[in-house]
Regions:
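Active-site and adjacent substrate-binding regions of carbohydrate-active enzymes
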Residues: 1-580, 584
Length: 585
């Protein structure tokens, strides 16, 4: 391993915020796809650094960087060949250090992906393991003389991999892989493997990263007679990682990627009796496809049901909520019937399918319907958890289903209507992927520059919504209460944290809908619309009636009775009044 740099000085105690991730708005950005600083056609760390002012303006609190390590790039960088090296196309360790410092200067934290389950078959560890079975790396991977062990482990990539075992002609044994055959699984029963992973984590923590997204954690161990997922040994290793991080660093976060049912995922938070001793955060995978399902069916039950079946989590922990990311819209956590329904509704062209999912971006999934995009974004920002945006969704970027695998949702960021969308000065043929030139989603129409100039654009709307979320701690820290309501097409809930009470009402139907809600707990309060400041009628004993436009929503602050007098006059008017009084004195 490379020598780690000196750890940065910790922030003063008074500036610490150990649970910053609960309030944060996360933003996933592909280094390769964001901005090219040197004209070679590939995005890089310096290009990303140059765009930090934009991300700060947007309101991003934390960047999530998928793998930028040395890699053959057969799986978007998730086939890592050096966990402490930067892919030369992306820059150097010094470039990363400068990027990290520039992000921190702007108040933006950075978490990075760590692929613990597997490596590339080009990793020196695997090359040594296959060529010298009795050497120091001989047991770093899971080897077998036949391919019959662990028959209960499902094949994840059913459209490309016939088995979880692949024969290696050099070692003349089979090696185990839960993902692609070029990604052999590490053998965590070998103590040296765990030590090597923690050493790699320490390298990046010493550089100053604010945490990690732990990729594919349910599959670290294998045991006969099991499906090889969520095993006790996996949790023990995560506890070890958490202890290591907590004992040596402050305010760092571990975000778990476990595409499982919530009842299994909550185990990755650890022991609730001690406030959680594994991961601080975990993605809520099942809620994501059900948002799409609920809006298409115009029924709230897919969302309300999965949230009702989500167990409580430790107070210090948080869900990560997302709509889209760098992978396909995964349909693993739905029934076969629901999967067929989602494919029929959202992937009418076979090219839109990938593995057990849909390889499309948010805007095309929603037919570029602004009302639906805004509704989905409002749900993303308001549901219990921290929202994770995917780069380009704030401007409604499209996809390219003509590209292979998941590359269709990983095209270059569209900055301007100029050549290469302002992403790179390279010849178009040298770009890592072609820019989107679609008549609707293409860079000539959909780009940051044009939407920055238009204050009515999706970009400005998204920025305003992020600002509103930040002004109301109930969204990040508050409790969640599903209100039900008289109309099954309307999904209504309350987020509450201290005196901050927010009523969120969402019309999942394309038609205008009325709803009556039981709000007697806040009788006499006068709700205030958060975005425009409009006052609504006072709540009484009778059911509270609201009418919403098609795919419309309300965010209403419910002031407590003691707050009513203070909020009767808008803040701007109060300032004007005080100014005029002093002028006349």
């Amino acid at each position: 391993m490379s020598a780690a740099p000196e750890p940065p000085a910790h922030a003063p105690e008074e500036h610490r915020d150990p649970e910053w991730y609960k309030r944060a708005v996360f933003y996933e950005v592909l280094v390769r796809g964001f901005a090219d600083s040197n004209g070679d056609g590939t995005g890089d760390l310096r290009g990303l650094t140059d765009k930090l002012d934009y991300l700060q303006w947007l309101g991003v609190d934390c960047l999530w960087l998928p793998p930028f390590y040395s890699s053959p790039l057969r799986d978007g960088g998730y086939d890592v060949s050096d966990l402490t090296g930067v892919l030369p196309e992306f820059g150097t360790i010094e470039d990363f250090r400068q990027f990290l410092g520039a992000a921190h200067d702007r108040g933006i934290k950075v978490i990075i992906d760590v692929v613990m389950n597997h490596t590339s078959d080009q990793h020196p560890w695997f090359q040594a393991s296959r060529s010298d079975p009795h050497g120091p790396y001989g047991d770093f991977y899971v080897w077998s003389d036949d391919d019959t062990r662990y028959p209960d482990a499902r094949i994840i990539f059913v459209d490309t991999e016939p088995s979880n075992w692949t024969f290696d002609p050099i070692r003349k044994q089979y090696y185990w892989h839960r993902f692609f055959s070029h990604q052999p699984d590490l053998n965590f029963d070998c103590p040296a493997v765990g030590d090597a992973i923690i050493e790699a984590l320490a390298f990046w923590l010493d550089l100053g990263v604010d945490g990690f997204r732990l990729d594919a954690v349910p599959y670290l161990y294998e045991r006969d007679g099991t499906n090889g997922e969520n095993l006790p040994e996996t949790h023990e290793f995560l506890k070890r990682v958490r202890r290591y991080v907590d004992d040596r660093y402050t305010d760092r976060v571990l975000l778990c990627e476990a595409n499982q049912w919530p009842g299994d995922v909550v185990e990755y938070f650890g022991d609730p009796a001690v406030g959680g001793d594994e991961c601080h955060m975990a993605f809520h995978f099942p809620v994501m496809p059900r948002i799409f399902m609920a809006v298409r069916r115009e029924q709230r039950y897919p969302i309300s049901e999965v949230l009702d079946r989500t167990p409580a989590i430790p107070d210090s922990c948080q869900w990560g909520i997302f709509l889209r990311n760098h992978d396909e819209l995964t349909l693993e956590m739905v029934t076969d019937e629901e999967r067929d329904y989602m494919w029929a509704e959202y992937a009418f062209d076979p090219r839109m399918k990938a593995n057990i999912g849909i390889r499309r971006r948010l805007a095309p999934l929603l037919d570029n319907d602004v009302n639906r995009i805004e509704l989905f974004t409002a749900l993303l920002l308001a549901l219990p958890g921290s929202p994770v945006l995917y780069y380009g969704d704030e401007i409604g970027m499209g996809d390219n289903i003509w590209l292979g695998d998941r590359d269709g949702v990983r095209t270059p960021m569209q900055w301007t209507p100029d050549r290469n969308a302002g992403f790179s000065t390279a010849e178009p043929a040298r770009l890592y992927l072609p820019v989107n030139m679609d008549s609707i989603y293409g860079y000539q129409v959909t780009n940051v520059e044009s939407q920055t100039r238009n204050t009515s654009s999706l970009l400005h709307w998204t920025r305003r919504m992020i600002q509103v979320r930040k002004q109301n701690p109930a969204f990040g820290l508050g409790s969640f209460h599903d209100l039900g309501g008289s109309n099954p097409s309307v999904f209504s809930f309350v987020r509450e944290f201290g005196d901050d009470i927010v009523l969120c009402v969402n019309n999942l139907s394309r038609f205008p809908q009325p709803v009556e809600l039981d709000l007697r707990d806040w009788e006499s309060a006068e709700p205030i619309e958060l975005i425009g400041g409009t006052r609504f009628p006072a709540i009484g004993e009778l059911p509270y009636l609201l009418t919403l436009s098609g795919h419309g929503f309300y965010w209403l602050r419910i002031p407590r009775p003691t707050q009513q007098v203070r909020q009767v006059v808008p803040e701007a008017s109060s300032v004007d009044f005080l100014t005029e009084s002093r002028a006349g004195a």
